[in-house]
Curated annotation (Swiss-Prot):
One of its GO terms (molecular function) is magnesium ion binding. Signal peptide: none annotated. Monomer. Pfam families: GTP1_OBG, MMR_HSR1. GTP binds at residues 166-173, 191-195, 213-216, 291-294, 322-324. InterPro entries: G_OBG, GTP-bd, GTP-bd_Obg/CgtA, GTP1-OBG_CS, GTP1_OBG_dom, GTP1_OBG_dom_sf, OBG_GTPase, P-loop_NTPase. This is GTPase Obg. It comes from Verminephrobacter eiseniae (strain EF01-2).
């Protein structure tokens, strides 16, 4: 799943119902007068921002969406029923544009936000509407108005919850493949990941969060070195950054490619690149994830972890995992979900009431 998901849909609101020509037929009333009712309005097409959705994949298999037309008017002053509305659930962050002109029409930014993307047509008038002093028996009615029909492009700029940082070959792609449904390319050479990947991590049937994997960062990325610069901006809306480090690379014999290069210095260089690129991105919560635990002798793990954390001067949480064998991934996933849930609860809290507008209460 790529960062920007797209889909094209056709929406059609319902046409309005036709008006009715009818006259009263009552005993002893030769000229009962008109009683044809109006047609009902056509159904609207709404879009709602659903915080439980992370992709537009459903719209790739169901392109056309039509609301019901309004009911026709009837005699005895009966109006037609309004057509049934339809509501399309879309992820938060969806941008809706006119497919023909490319003009942005709407943007769903808030959970639960509802917008009308196509309005149903008004119902036609029945002949009772045309009664006047000079026309007591009108035989005129109007058809219903057509509903709006639009071809739309849906573009999702995904709001990932968690972003992965690290040097090329740190094991970011292996991690996202281990804990999510993403299947990025994994190989033993730098910059295997050439474009961002998203993975939806499902903790429970209706509990999930989104992880974003971007190409590895190297020193000078903020000036354009490597591949990561053009994708760093996609991490600016994340709630948490995971700095994934190859723990086995501390043994220079394991990775000849980085022989003679201090992994701690490399980790510090990535942190400095964040700071140069965007101070707000640098200030985000950042957890240290030491990967490739399976390649480190069991007797050396604790000392190696303590030495790395001490030299890096990392103050936040530290996790030790093996993305290949899944060791330690479970506790990390549950800790991430708890952090994401906490942030979501804070976002949903109502703003504090301005004391100037608070009620004074009983005297």
């Amino acid at each position: 799943m790529k960062f920007v998901d797209e889909a094209f849909i056709d929406v059609a609101a319902g046409d309005g119902g036709n008006g009715c020509v009818s006259f009263r037929h009552e005993k002893y009333k030769e000229f009962g007068g008109p009683n044809g009712g109006d047609g009902g309005r056509g159904g609207h097409v709404f879009a709602v921002a659903d915080p439980n959705l992370n992709t537009l994949v459903d719209f790739r298999y169901a392109r056309r969406h039509e609301a019901k037309r309004g009911g026709h008017g009837m005699g005895s002053d009966m109006f037609g029923a309004a057509g049934a509305d339809i509501t399309l659930k879309m992820p938060v962050g969806t941008i809706i544009t006119d497919a023909a002109t490319g003009q942005p029409l709407y943007e769903l930014l808030l959970p639960g936000e509802v917008i009308t993307i196509a309005r149903g047509g008004d119902g036609g008038f029945g002949n009772m509407r045309f009664k006047s002093a000079i026309n007591r028996a009108p035989r005129h009615k109007t058809p219903g108005w057509p509903g709006e029909k639009k071809s739309l492009k849906l573009e999702l700029k995904v709001l990932a919850d968690v972003g992965l940082l690290g040097r090329p070959n740190a094991g970011k792609s292996t991690f996202i493949a281990a804990v999510s449904n993403a299947r990025p390319k994994i190989a033993d050479y730098p910059f295997t990941t050439l474009h961002p990947h998203l993975g939806v991590v499902r903790v429970a049937p209706e509990q999930s969060f989104v992880v974003a994997d971007i190409p590895g960062l190297i020193e000078g990325a903020s000036e354009g070195a490597g591949l990561g610069l053009q994708f760093l901006r996609h991490l600016q809306r994340t709630r948490l950054l995971l700095h994934i480090v190859d723990l086995a690379a501390l043994d220079t014999g394991v990775d000849a490619q980085d022989a003679g290069v201090d992994p701690v210095a490399q980790a510090k260089a990535i942190i400095n690149e964040l700071k140069k690129y965007d101070r707000q991105l640098y200030d985000k919560p950042r957890w240290l994830v030491l990967n490739k635990l399976d390649m480190v002798p069991a007797g050396e793990r604790q000392a190696r972890v303590q030495d790395f954390v001490k030299r890096l001067k990392h103050q936040g949480p530290v996790f030790e995992i093996s993305a290949l064998t899944h060791e330690g991934c479970g506790p990390l996933v549950h800790a991430i979900f708890g952090h994401v849930q906490s942030g979501q609860r804070m976002d949903n809290e109502p703003p504090p009431l301005d004391p100037r507008f608070a009620s004074a209460g009983p005297a």
